Amino acid sequence: MKYIHILLVFIILSLFITVIKSNYYDNNNQNQNQYSYHHTYNNNNQGNYQSKNVHSESEQNSYNKETRNNNDDDDDDENFERNKKSIRSRYHGYTYRNDQIQSRGNSAKGGSYSESTYFTLHSGTDRYGRRNDYSRFQTRGRSNGYRENMFLNVFDVVGNIKTTRNKRKITKSEKNGRYIKKDHMNNRDSNTNINEKPEYSKSPVFQGGYRSLEKNFTTNYGNSSNASIPLSGKQSQL
């Protein structure tokens, strides 16, 4: 019962911190959202695609056509005009800085690779906060693919416990390594236990059930100049 109460306290605290975080972002980051790619201004229904001097779609189309016609001959002038009088705001949602595209604001559609979500139960992401294509959650944060600095929730705790258990499991190769490291008679030059038999009793390396001490046998069988087992008569004739 004590662990159940502790679990409930974790869940309540996670939800409480989530509400605080979401309210903080909603109240203090509106200026960040206004430059988002999908944001639409409320003032005179001016969209994010419109320039400052154009107030209707027809004027916008004519402005774009005129700009293209006037600058067809000179690519440098065309790029200069597009940068100077862009159909988007200069501070739009994807700003080029240091040859990298930085996404500002939030985007519920494709193009946002940020990891933080507003919810503890983020069914649109995996347990690390990485979004799926069908996610419609509002997201914030850096674009490294993992949820960071958000809050401690029960799912992360359970996941860490499971990961720790998996690390404690011994793989097959590790078991073989432990077997080799044990003080077995096959890894020793002699054995004090008379009743213990070698694993490979017919091996020419062993004499009387134990490793031979008369010759300096090696284990480098791949090198013919350092072969440990003498060739038989038939093999030497070949």
UniProtKB/Swiss-Prot annotation:
InterPro entries, per database record: TES
Biased composition (Basic and acidic residues): 171-187
Entry function: FS800 is likely to have some function in the production or maintenance of the schistosome egg.
Composition skew (Low complexity), residue ranges: 35-50
Pfam families reported for this sequence: TES
The protein, known as: Female-specific protein 800
Further comment: The two FS800 proteins are read from two overlapping reading frames.
Superkingdom: Eukaryota
